[in-house]
From Swiss-Prot:
Its EC number is 1.4.4.2. The keyword ATP-binding does not apply. It holds the Pfam family GDC-P. This is Probable glycine dehydrogenase (decarboxylating) subunit 1. GO terms for biological process: glycine decarboxylation via glycine cleavage system; nucleoside metabolic process. Keywords: Oxidoreductase. It comes from Bacillus cereus (strain ATCC 10987 / NRS 248). PANTHER family: GLYCINE CLEAVAGE SYSTEM P-PROTEIN, GLYCINE DEHYDROGENASE (DECARBOXYLATING). It comes from the Bacteria. The keyword Oxidoreductase applies. The gene is gcvPA.
């Protein structure tokens, strides 16, 4: 190209035609019959200037219900949290601005160190020994955990609580179908996994049991009781967890979890329709050589200086091919970096305070709903989400709330017929007392 930023100039076209030995564009396409060639002009709008284009796109974007102008009480896996300003600044640096894993670690020390710090912080939050460099999202991390369990135990049955995120369960079903595994759902009772049903289903054919903590309804599962049931038959205990909640809750590792997975979206990753997110995957040392995805390790170079490498690669698909522990050969490097920067900026006390505010504000919202005459469906402890009985279709309620610049909660009837007309309300640290009061009052007026 003669001009780096002006591709396909007349000079470029002439040079390319000469190189391939033809004189004109028509000669280049001479093999295409004249009868089927397009003639005339394409029916597209005239080109716009940069300022005109920005104005038009801004007008289109303004039609969306964005979280700068709307108070959001919608969670169900994607949450409106505070992201420190420094996050965007750091991840926009050219050295970091890639979603991919470095293949030349010796010249990517900064990137590898950032991933190493992500792994370290995930281990500290979950109480586990080792974490990978991240997964695509929480759903794929959950499915990969089940595949690891099935491969390790050589058993074909997977038990998953119905209180696990419905979309994560759908991803699990997709993975399991290809591996000819049986997925059995354990019903929930009073908002948490039914332990009696779980006890009756766990036998020596079960590879693993998967629960969520806090679960999809916001309730805190009794991990200590579940762990005893699971390990009686030497099945693996897998816990999907909101990492922010672990700033306040006892980490799953303390309850004997074998694998802890989840989505790091609460840390520095904005809400968005469809992703990308950042799954995390942490486990005990026993499964270190079976963990999926990239692992960054710390070492020293020939001069004795600290360095970072992609380690234990012999288990990965690009080396072991069909015998690899997983098909994933990548990670979410940029979003993992965002999560690392957010956690670092907040610090340990900041993460704890952020989690505490989620709990206190959600508790305040629950009390306000009850004072207004609403029924909060489940009575157990919860983190930042709870279920409200709307007594009418949730869609009607949300449509009315949207007119008041409020994004209402998740319609549980979409996934659970028994919870029709029930709304899953999420309250994060960003919601103010005024916003919570307005939500409750507006829903009370609709009731």
């Amino acid at each position: 190209m003669l001009h780096r930023y002006l591709p396909m100039t007349e000079e470029d076209k002439k040079e390319m035609l000469q190189t391939i030995g033809v004189q004109t564009i028509d000669e280049l396409f001479s093999d295409i019959p004249e009868s089927v060639r397009f003639k005339g002009d394409l029916k597209i709008k005239e080109a716009k200037s940069e300022s005109e284009l920005l104005k038009e796109l801004s007008q289109m974007a303004s039609k969306n219900a964005n979280l700068k102008e709307y108070a959001s009480f919608l969670g169900a896996g994607v949450y409106d949290h505070y992201a420190p300003v420094i996050v965007d600044h750091v991840i926009s640096r050219s050295e970091f601005y890639t979603a991919y894993t470095p293949y030349q670690p010796e010249i990517s020390q900064g990137e590898l160190q950032a991933i190493f710090e992500f792994q370290t912080m995930i281990c500290e939050l979950t109480g586990m020994d080792v974490a990978n460099s991240s997964m695509y999202d929480g759903g794929t991390a959950l499915a990969e955990a089940a595949m690891l369990a099935a491969g390790h135990t050589r058993k074909k049955k997977i038990l998953v609580s119905s209180a696990v995120h419905p979309e994560s369960r759908a991803v699990l079903e997709t993975y399991a179908k290809g591996q000819h595994l049986e997925v059995v759902e354990i019903n929930h009772k009073d908002g948490v996994t039914d332990l009696d049903v779980l006890q009756s289903e766990v036998d020596d054919t079960v590879a693993c049991v998967i629960v969520q903590y806090p679960n999809f309804f916001g309730q805190v599962e009794k991990l200590a009781d579940i762990e005893k049931i699971v390990h009686q038959q030497k099945s693996l205990f897998i816990v999907s967890s909101n990492p922010l909640s672990l700033g306040a809750l006892t980490p799953p590792g303390k309850f004997g979890a074998d694998i802890v997975i989840g989505d790091a979206q609460p840390f520095g990753i904005p809400t968005q329709f469809g992703g990308p997110h950042c799954g995390y995957f942490a486990t005990t040392k026993a499964f270190m050589r079976k963990i999926p995805g990239r692992l960054v390790g710390q070492t020293v170079d020939s001069d004795g200086k600290r360095g970072f490498v992609l380690t234990l690669q012999a288990r990965e698909q690009h080396i072991r091919r069909d015998k690899a522990t997983s098909n994933i050969c990548s990670n979410q490097a940029l979003n993992a970096l965002a999560a690392s920067v957010a956690m670092t900026a907040l610090g340990k006390q900041g993460v704890k305070e952020m989690a505490r505010q989620n709990i206190s504000k959600a508790q305040y919202a629950k009390r306000q709903f009850e004072a207004k005459g609403f029924t909060v469906t489940f009575a157990g402890p919860f983190f930042n989400e709870f279920v409200v009985d709307c007594k009418r279709p949730v869609k009607e309620v949300n449509d009315a709330l949207l007119q008041k610049n409020i994004i209402g909660g998740y319609d549980l009837g979409r996934d659970y017929k028994e919870h029709e007309n029930h709304m899953l309300v999420a309250v994060t640290e960003l919601r103010t007392k005024e916003e919570i009061d307005t939500l409750v009052n507006e829903m009370g007026a609709i009731q």
